[in-house]
Amino acid sequence: MSMECVVQGIIETQHVEALEILLQGLCGVQRERLRVHELCLRSGPNLGVVSSEVRLLCDLDQPEPTWTVKHVGGAMRGAGADQISVLVRNMIESKVSKNALRMFYALGYKLDHELLKVGFAFHFQRTAHISVSVSSVNKMPKVHAIDEAVPVTPGMQIVDVTAPATSENYSEVAAAVSSFCEFLAPLVHLSKPSISTGVVPTAAAAAASLMSDGGGTTL
C-alpha cells in the first residue's frame, strides 16, 4: 500500500507572490502551472454498507487533458502518529483514460462535489520527493461549469505540501516535510489538514522582506 505525508495551510492572496519567490529559492526548480478539475465521487448503496470515496483529477494545463484517479485511505493512528507533525495516510493513485468518469457512474458512484484548483506547484527532491502547490480553490454553480467557477474563500489560497512514502520510510519522509515547512513558517503555517491554524501574523513583514531582496537561497 502506498502512503503519503501531507500538511496544509492558508495564505492571503496578497502574499502569494512572496511565497513563490521563497519557494523558487528553496526548491531550485521552475514552478509549474496548476489548473486541475477535481471531481469527488461517492459509492452508492449497491457497493456496500461503508461509503467509498474516489477523486478524479483532470489536469487542464496539458495540451490534451490528462486524468488521474486517487483514493485516499485512513490516516495513521496511535501514539506514533500523534508525535508526527504531518498527516500520514494510505493512498492509491493511477493514471486513467478520459472515460473513467463514465465507468465510475456505471459502477454506481455519484458525483458528490467538484472543484477547480488554479495556481502553481513546485516538485523537487530533498530526502523525499516533495510537492508544494499553492492554489485558489473554486466551486462551480452548475455541474462541470468550469468557466463559471468562483472562489470558495476569496482573498485566500491553499498551500499543500505532499510527499509519497511507504510503511518502511514514512518517518524519514515526514521529517523531511517538517524540516522543509520550517523555512515557510514566516509566511504560512502548515499542519495536518484536520487542524485549522489560520494565517501567520508575521506574513506581511516576511512578504515585504522577500519582495525587497528577491528570495532566498537554494537548499
Swiss-Prot record:
Keyword Magnesium: no
InterPro entries according to UniProt: Mediator_Med18 (IPR019095)
Consequences of knocking out this gene: Deregulated expression of glutaredoxins GRX480, GRXS13 and thioredoxin TRX-h5 leading to enhanced susceptibility to fungal infection (e.g. B.cinerea and A.brassicicola). Altered RNA polymerase II occupancy and histone H3 lysine tri-methylation (H3K36me3) of target genes. Insensitivity to abscisic acid (ABA) and to the ethylene precursor 1-aminocyclopropane-1-carboxylic acid (ACC). Delayed flowering.
GO biological process: abscisic acid-activated signaling pathway; carpel development; defense response; DNA-templated transcription termination; ethylene-activated signaling pathway; miRNA processing; negative regulation of DNA-templated transcription; petal development
Pfam family, one: Med18
Described function: Component of the Mediator complex, a coactivator involved in the regulated transcription of nearly all RNA polymerase II-dependent genes. Mediator functions as a bridge to convey information from gene-specific regulatory proteins to the basal RNA polymerase II transcription machinery. The Mediator complex, having a compact conformation in its free form, is recruited to promoters by direct interactions with regulatory proteins and serves for the assembly of a functional pre-initiation complex with RNA polymerase II and the general transcription factors.
Family recorded in the similarity comment: Belongs to the Mediator complex subunit 18 family.
Identification of the protein by name: Mediator of RNA polymerase II transcription subunit 18
UniProt organism field: Arabidopsis thaliana (Mouse-ear cress)
Classification of source organism: Eukaryota, Viridiplantae, Streptophyta, Embryophyta, Tracheophyta
